[in-house]
Amino acid sequence: MNIVVLVKQVPAISDIEIAKDNNLVRVGAPSMLNPVDKHAIEAAVAVKDAIGGTVTILTMGNALAGEMMRDGIAIGADKGVLVSDERMAGSDTLATGLVLAKAIEKLGGADLVFTGKRSTDGDTGQIPPAIAQRLGMALISYANSVSVDGTTVTATRLNHDGIETVQAQLP
């Protein structure tokens, strides 16, 4: 089972500074692993421990993202891949989704892709559906728990009526 976890380097929550134009000050600001991405890594590692496979952390960013990726490896991921190019600095979610999907393809594809719900710095939540669409994969969003049995992924998530169980076939 080849599992990819998308992670993001975000400004440290305790040190967020807002510029006069209402954008986050990123230059020189301390950064950290997006907190909800930690849960995605933990879920991916739990699946790997249950059925075997490899967990690869994938991120797009500058060289400083390497430190953040070490945190993910400490949680239990097997390796990390950083996609970095100055031409991608400040890219929007459309470009980011395309680059990350192409990176997953270059890595040989993925049986499962885990992400956090959204990043603390952008809060758009657009990357998971963009990746699923580009890779032709099913998307199970807002999962609280995940399990894999044979060729089926089962997840539970909260909805307006309580707890919902959803399933999707592995590629």
Predicted regions and their residues:
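N-terminal glycine-rich FAD/FM-binding segment characteristic of electron-transfer flavoproteins
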Residues: 1-171
